[in-house]
A protein has these predicted regions:
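Conserved glycine-rich cofactor-binding loop
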Residues: 12-14
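The beta1-alpha1 cofactor-binding region of Rossmann-like NAD(H)/NADP(H)-dependent oxidoreductases
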Residues: 58-69, 102
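Residue(s) in the substrate-gating loop at a strand-loop-helix junction
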Residues: 139
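Conserved glycine-rich Rossmann-like NAD(P)H-binding loop of the short-chain dehydrogenase/reductase
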Residues: 26-42
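Active-site helix of classical SDR
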Residues: 120, 155
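Substrate-binding pocket helix/loop in short-chain dehydrogenase/reductase
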Residues: 95-97, 104-106
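C-terminal beta-strand-loop-alpha-helix "lid" module of Rossmann-like NAD(P)-dependent dehydrogenases
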Residues: 173-220
């Protein structure tokens, strides 16, 4: 039997890199995409060292025609596309809505929301054909806002809303969907230098606000730190293997505790999913 073809976005670092390598080791044919050519070369070396094969391809998810072209090419070359992990989108602009420029908001939304949406739209015809799996990584901040994460939370809320609305519809055509909601994960995006590049701020005269990175680093330190990125790959593989995966999945107890007050008794999204299915059923 031919191996299942899995497309993973954002594989040049962090969770995407771990997911791609772990999936290849588990027997998937993995198409690993990213937009940093130097790091893609490093990923190829790491795959070779681990004795796994990756089909590594350049992809800038904000280039929507390129997204459609690449996903179409993947389906043609491999003959099918069985699963997509759309997880590129760790773009931050720390600060309040007052501080972050309008261009800063657009910059964050363009990658975190519109880029992932382009991947989903391009992949769905192929996933319907294979009755495949769609996993979309958002964040615990896609359900619960957090101070100084205004733009990031907005982008993740938007993605959560789109995928939550989509999931019960595409399920009727054989596509099973899961929204993955990590808390802080030990990736490069959590490094201070990464944030400093993305502090797209308007000047606030006599600003009462603390320095955003200092605030965030203290919060992370007081909540038990970050999740090891190596924990995420096996969790994604488990979700891909489930016959009836949940609509929602939090990768760590911290994330579950963080979103629980808002989700109450529906942590895995089953109740909202069933309500949506009933709503669809009203149309006959």
């Amino acid at each position: 039997m031919a191996s299942k073809v899995l497309l993973v976005t954002g594989t040049t670092s962090g969770m995407g890199r771990t997911i791609a390598l772990d999936a290849a080791a588990a027997g998937y044919t993995v198409v690993a995409t990213g937009r940093d050519e130097q790091r893609m070369a490093e990923l190829a070396k790491e795959a070779k060292a681990r004795q796994v094969e990756l089909d590594i391809r350049f992809l800038e998810i904000t280039d929507h025609p390129a997204v459609y072209a690449l996903i179409g090419a993947v389906a043609r070359i491999h003959g099918h596309l069985d699963a997509v992990v759309s997880q590129a989108g760790g773009i931050f602009a720390l600060g309040t809505a007052e501080q972050i420029t309008m261009d800063g908001f657009r910059f964050v939304l363009e990658t975190n929301f519109f880029g992932n949406l382009a991947v989903i739209k391009a992949a769905l015809p192929h996933l319907r054909a294979s009755k495949g799996r769609l996993i979309v990584t958002t964040s615990a901040n896609g359900l619960v806002g957090a101070p100084y994460n205004d733009a990031y939370a907005a982008s993740k809320f938007a993605l959560e809303g789109a995928v939550e609305s989509l999931a019960p519809v595409v399920a009727r055509y054989g596509v099973r969907t899961t929204i993955v909601e990590p808390g802080p994960v030990a990736t490069e995006v959590m490094a201070p230098r990464r944030f400093e590049k993305l502090l797209l701020h308007d000047a606030v005269e006599n600003s009462p606000y603390p320095e955003p990175w200092d605030f965030l680093s203290r919060v992370i330190g007081n909540t038990g730190g970050v999740q090891a990125v190596e924990e995420v790959g096996p969790q994604i593989l488990d979700l891909l293997a489930r016959d009836n995966p949940p609509l929602r999945f939090q990768t760590a107890q911290w994330a579950r505790d963080f979103v629980a007050p808002k989700l109450s008794a529906d942590l895995d999204g089953k109740k909202v999913y069933e309500a949506s299915e009933a709503y669809i059923g009203l149309a006959g």
